[in-house]
């Protein structure tokens, strides 16, 4: 195998590892985000765990974060919570940074 092939394989492995790490970080972010939203919605005990699962599943529907934003925004609206889309997006960013620290 040539050094070019070795280098190519190394880059492919790094890319795969980076993608796996991003997936794990987003999973942790979604858990933190789900806990925050559940608290704001007044969920208790098992309702919190169930809601976290709903949030995690919502993120798997479409690429990007808008599916999470829409889901939580609709839930807040249904419960008459006054939390803006900007605050929701800000929390996603905050929890992403927190989750990154978990993997350092």
Task: Indicate residue ranges for each PLM-predicted region.
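A charge-rich, low-complexity, intrinsically flexible signal that marks solvent-exposed coils, linkers
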Residues: 1-104
